[in-house]
Amino acid sequence: MRRAERAVTDREKILRILDACHCCRVGFSDPDGAYIVPLSFAFVPGTPDRFYFHGAKEGRKAALIAARPKVGFELDCSYALVEGTSGCSYSCRYQSVIGTGRIGEVTDMEEKKQALAAIMAHYEPEKSFAFTDEQAQRVAVFRLDVAELTCKERS
């Protein structure tokens, strides 16, 4: 990280920042170039830390996950413009998380249902959600096992 003074290393603060984010962008690479997908997500801390996503069972994203599971990811929040006296002196406040990991499809039905409930809980923390096998079978659920994660902020 070039600006080490902006690094966030406190685990609890990183978890709060992740909780404040609404979108996780996952980046893939294939022979045609880079491909970035914005996704709804759940973050589950552990060893390893994990992100869960859901989506279609077919398409470019699903094909890339099967063929090239090494990915990068990015989340950001708390963006605010900092005005300056000239265009070159403008800046912004932000919090961001970036990292790398391996992504794959979840096939265990119980893990799929728990992942879907965790995704919903991220966006509706005051509600409880349960999914049937039939509902979970209709979508693909993907798990990203985090290999590296860094967090940065400018406040």
Q: What residue spans do the PLM features occupy?
A:
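Extreme N-terminal tail/first-helix region
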Residues: M1-D19
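Charged, gly/pro-rich active-site loop segments
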Residues: R2-E5, S78-S155
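Short Pro/Gly-enriched beta-strand edge/turn motifs at strand-loop
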Residues: V8-D10, A20-R25, P125-K127
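A generic structural signal for nonpolar/aromatic side chains embedded in well-ordered alpha-helices
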Residues: L18, L64-I65, I119
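Short beta-strand segments
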Residues: C21-K57
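Short, structured patches in soluble enzyme cores that scaffold and shape functional sites
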Residues: F28-D30, G55, L75-C77, V146-E148
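A short mixed-secondary-structure module that forms the rim of ligand-binding clefts
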Residues: A42-A80
